[in-house]
């Protein structure tokens, strides 16, 4: 495998070393972009191992920061494309990895930049900035750009993604993600494993694309958003805002769901409801 040749020496396990690098580059971690550095090497290795990178696979990394994960990834992949929004971090990444043939740096917002990139890739990785995690995942699903992904996100969001039917965390986002991916929890990570230490816990999830039979994604997405906007109301009181032909409410296929709240309807049932409603349009 290809080895990374560092032009800068950062000890990613040392808060002192990280602080020194940030001081030299006049960088302060920004909460806006979720800039917290994972300083536990064992956890970093475990996360990368969960990607199960095969030889010749091409990887995207979103928000590499100082490059702790990037350094490991470059030893395992023939091509790593890294998207970094912060220009000062981009400068560090260029200094460290810019001469490597298997490294490509894209400067700017991932959501704006990725549509212009070659999408012939195998997997996506990120310690996603907490404030954009749901946006990134939703956008990739909406664009039907479904790849095997390993994301570290705020535990609160991970709990929504992995939620079971009939639970308080079961939401439209749960249904959106689980309708497109098999979700596997890799590890929970306490705040003490980061610098600066966040007040919240993090969770690493693996998302594996799965086949679905959603006939009209826009209608499906609109349906789940509509009914979960009033999650305590029964379906008969919320679905009326979604359908145009009220006669559909008298159809047998809907009757078993009308007195249920959205949190009591499974992912598969939402797909069935959406597909049937689509057929009536």
UniProtKB/Swiss-Prot annotation:
GO cellular component terms, A-Z: cytosol
Subcellular location(s) of the protein: Cytoplasm
Catalytic activity entry: adenosine(1518)/adenosine(1519) in 16S rRNA + 4 S-adenosyl-L-methionine = N(6)-dimethyladenosine(1518)/N(6)-dimethyladenosine(1519) in 16S rRNA + 4 S-adenosyl-L-homocysteine + 4 H(+)
Binding site for S-adenosyl-L-methionine: 36, 38, 63, 84, 109, 127
GO molecular function terms noted in the UniProt entry: 16S rRNA (adenine(1518)-N(6)/adenine(1519)-N(6))-dimethyltransferase activity; RNA binding
UniProt entry keywords in alphabetical sequence: Cytoplasm, Methyltransferase, RNA-binding, rRNA processing, S-adenosyl-L-methionine, Transferase
Keyword Nucleotidyltransferase on entry: no
InterPro entries on file: KsgA/Erm, rRNA_Ade_diMease-like_C, rRNA_Ade_Mease_Trfase_CS, rRNA_Ade_methylase_Trfase_N, rRNA_adenine_dimethylase, SAM-dependent_MTases_sf
Gene3D superfamilies attached to this UniProt entry: Ribosomal RNA adenine dimethylase-like, domain 2, Vaccinia Virus protein VP39
Keyword Nuclease: no
CDD domains (UniProt xref): AdoMet_MTases
Entry's EC annotation: 2.1.1.182
Primary location group: cytoplasm
UniProt family annotation: Belongs to the class I-like SAM-binding methyltransferase superfamily. rRNA adenine N(6)-methyltransferase family. RsmA subfamily.
Stored PANTHER family: DIMETHYLADENOSINE TRANSFERASE, DIMETHYLADENOSINE TRANSFERASE-RELATED
Record-linked NCBIfam families: ksgA (TIGR00755)
Function: Specifically dimethylates two adjacent adenosines (A1518 and A1519) in the loop of a conserved hairpin near the 3'-end of 16S rRNA in the 30S particle. May play a critical role in biogenesis of 30S subunits.
Name this polypeptide is given: Ribosomal RNA small subunit methyltransferase A
Species whose genome carries this gene: Borreliella afzelii (strain PKo)
């Amino acid at each position: 495998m290809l080895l990374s040749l560092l032009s800068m020496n950062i000890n990613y396990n040392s808060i002192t070393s990280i602080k020194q690098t940030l001081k030299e580059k006049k960088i302060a971690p920004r909460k806006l972009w979720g800039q917290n550095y994972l300083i536990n090497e064992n956890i970093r290795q475990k996360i990368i191992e969960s990607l199960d990178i095969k030889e010749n696979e091409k990887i995207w990394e979103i928000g590499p920061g100082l490059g702790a994960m990037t350094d490991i990834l470059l030893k395992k992949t023939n091509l790593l494309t890294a998207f970094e929004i912060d220009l000062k971090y981009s400068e560090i990444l260029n200094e460290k990895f810019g001469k490597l043939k298997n490294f490509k740096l894209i400067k700017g917002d991932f959501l704006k930049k990725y549509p212009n990139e070659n999408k012939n890739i195998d997997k996506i990785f990120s310690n996603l900035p907490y404030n954009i995690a749901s946006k990134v995942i939703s956008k990739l699903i909406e664009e039907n750009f479904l790849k095997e992904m390993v994301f570290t996100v705020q535990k609160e969001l991970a709990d929504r993604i992995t939620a079971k039917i009939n639970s308080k965390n079961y939401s439209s986002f749960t249904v959106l993600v689980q309708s497109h991916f098999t979700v596997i929890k890799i590890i929970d990570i306490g705040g003490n494993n980061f610098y600066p230490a966040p007040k919240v816990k993090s969770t690493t999830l693996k998302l594996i694309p799965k086949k679905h039979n959603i006939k009209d994604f826009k209608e499906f997405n609109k349906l789940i958003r509509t009914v979960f906007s009033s999650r305590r109301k029964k379906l008969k009181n919320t679905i009326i805002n979604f359908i145009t032909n009220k006669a559909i409410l008298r159809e047998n296929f809907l009757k078993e769901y009308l007195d249920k709240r959205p949190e009591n309807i499974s992912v598969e049932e939402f797909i069935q409801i959406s597909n049937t409603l689509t057929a009536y349009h």
